[in-house]
Amino acid sequence: MFNYFRKELDLGGRTLVLETGKIARQADGAVLARLGDTIVLCTAVGAKSAKAGQDFFPLTVNYQEKAFAAGKIPGGFFKREGRPSEHETLVSRLIDRPIRPLFPEGFYNEVQVIATVLSHDMENDPDIVALIGCSAALTLSGIPFFGPVAASRVGLVNGAFVLNPTLEQRAESKLDLVVAGTAEGVLMVESEAEELSEDQMLAAVEFGHKGFQPVIDAIIALAEHAARDPWTLPEQNPEHVALKQRLNEAGRTLLGNAYQEKVKQLRQEKISAAKKQIIETLGIGGTPEESIAKSMLKDLEADIVRNAILDTGIRIDGRDTRTVRPIIGEVGILPRAHGSALFTRGETQALCVATLGTGQDEQVVDALTGEYRSHFMLHYNFPPYSVGEAGRMGSPGRREIGHGKLAWRAVHPVLPAKDAFPYTLRVVSEITESNGSSSMATVCGSSLALMDAGVPLKRPVAGIAMGLIKEDRAFAVLSDILGDEDHLGDMDFKVAGTEQGVTSLQMDIKITSITTEIMRIALQQARDGRMHILGEMAKAITGARGSVAATAPRITVINVPKEKIREVIGTGGKVIREIVEFSGAKIDIEDDGTIKIASTSEESTQKAIDRIQGIVAEPEVGKIYNGKVVKTADFGAFVNFLGSRDGLVHISELQQGRVNKTSDVINVGDVVKVKVLGFDDRGKVKLSMRLVDQTTGEDISDKVGPKGGRGGRGEGDLAE
């Protein structure tokens, strides 16, 4: 019944298994990928024909994690998986990026790739398994695909690279790098690092590329037994070949002249006018050929721009290949924000705002591996006005989530330790203008905003986007690329870091692969650009401000014995709620006895501290405390002191001399001063008012005689 095939190989000391022919047999390609007990079902399906008028490749990649994979039931009212989480979106992009360049040019059939996590062993991350499985599914499907690709994760533990580290090893690693590519070269890199050198980053990429070579061999071996017949691509229409030639003759000069304009919006207007004139000149307006011609004009644009750069070394806006656009950094531009910055680089601009919060503001993430809390968030927004358009507004899309995470990875390694700076941090980046490299503008602006907010970063962080123009005859690496250079080029290579080293690196290749030599040149050129940008940023602010903004909460940390936590919280949280209501401060209590008190008012903070210390402090014999009478009886009065602690003032200790009734001296609600005499055999506190001057709070033990009894006078009054 099943036409089943299986391939096993060793991957970093663990067994990777690829199976096909048993599950999802109606998909064009289906592979069950397994590493340890982590299992991902990967499928690929393609439409047999393109939609009429389609002029782009509609590839969709969906990565989804099922709660049952970790033995869980989803939360929420409906108790089923809902919209993709941020993590699922990021992994979907991780799979999409290395496979997209490997479909043939002009292939416009819809293709859908789905990766479903069926089992998670809490040791092997499913993302690499999913990417490998999706590559295998496409290779088996018969869909035109110039693969296979494979991927590996590289860690750096105790100074040595580790291939596909476990979740436990990743927690100790100074590097989290994912590299994907073909047997010949690298297609995609994504990483977070603790200020590593460019040489270390390049060595990690090479280590990862070498590490996944057996996976490519295994996919090819599996395809030899189980691949479907390859699809037959339609031959190029001779009429289209002729149309392309006519467009080249009629449009090369017009488009070339339009690209001489240095200002983005004016250039776009001239390009649009040139295209319209070309269509009119050829007399194909309103015909089926018009849509085909518009698609071909994109290729002509790319050819004009790319060859101009290779021939002259001069780019669209007049720069050479290494020059960074003019930079202006400003901080403190929003008066009520905790920290703010406006970072402008040419025609790209980011308004970044930092907000400081408490532990109650941490993001709670319910992941397959368990619930955890994140105290640093970075949100990237790309409104349509940033490119002069009217468009959709709503929840963030995949691109915004991906760019935000890239900037997060760049800044995260330089944040202070949580115990040294116990704030929850949120940075929002509003892209107010865009002409390329907005994610790297976010990195720079976020660094400035955090320093403006008083966050003691280890060092400022800057980012730069590199591009590549590569033809058989030559190549050029471009620093600080424009939007058009990103669109028409062969590489988007983003590097962020400090003056000490790289904190994040992301590379996407639009051609089949690039060489180590090109990567080395790009990394060195990026370092030069990064140093220049850091110098420009230093003109705005060189380090964190000495204190947080007046509008930000001040967090004071105190520690109490672990066994006292229950007393501070109270039954059902009653005591802590009363303290919060009384003081107006926010209070976070951790299991180890650390208590964080946050308020914009010092008075509010001190009120909370006094209450808490009163609860946890132990009464000291001989010490005088302020108290309040909470109950009276024939034999004395109960006084509340040290927060919620009560003690007994015996009637003989109320005052010097004879006392007939307790109420003759004090009543409920009276504020008094008491001295701790000791503890009875049940641990109850014995107090005295008689030995304390109730006006000054002075200890007068040496000035009074023996205590008096009930119904009689004492042996002495105040000593003369």
From Swiss-Prot:
Keywords: Cytoplasm, Magnesium, Metal-binding, Nucleotidyltransferase, RNA-binding, Transferase. Its EC number is 2.7.7.8. The keyword Cytoplasm applies. Residues 698-720 are annotated as: Disordered. Transmembrane segments: none annotated. Belongs to the polyribonucleotide nucleotidyltransferase family. This is Polyribonucleotide nucleotidyltransferase.
